[in-house]
Amino acid sequence: MTLQEMKKKVLGLIEELNPLSEYLTDDPDIQAKINEVTNQIMFELVRFKKMPKYVEIHVNEGDILEFADIEKECGYEIYQIDIICGVRYVPKASGTVLKFMETGTAEISCFVYPERITEKTKDKAYEFELSQDVLEVMPYGIAGDLLKSDVSTEYGAVYSNRYQEMLSRLDHRYQMPTMYIDGGVDV
């Protein structure tokens, strides 16, 4: 889904959509806030249903890697490391720094934030990297936040409540845990 499609969904929900307007709405407050509100909801959702990434980095014994080094390799802002295989390491600084105890290839699975939306972001070009179920929840969170300061109506609370309800039903897993055992002992 593109940013433009998301904006159309949100603005349609809150009855502020004007498809003839360059900004899809005539409301200047919504025009000014929609990108930042979209970021806030997107980042909230991605901490609930994490965005996994995988990267391989060649390391030498004694090398120290920080989040920034891993971010350069994978091209995303990391907020949590999941699993590291392939080489022995010792986590430092609450796991944000890794000291490698041997030479080899570090196979790093981590969780990242999506690309941030700015005023320069092209609505038609920006593609959300979130799962389909998250994209179905997201418009309600955006709508609720856009309307929460509008005290003349209850729309903000209606959309916020719907968002919380949908969020509580969202499954944070991408797959069910599985185990494969190879080999074994003949008795």
List each language-model region with its residue ranges.
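Glycine-enriched, solvent-exposed interface loops adjoining structured elements
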Residues: 1-187
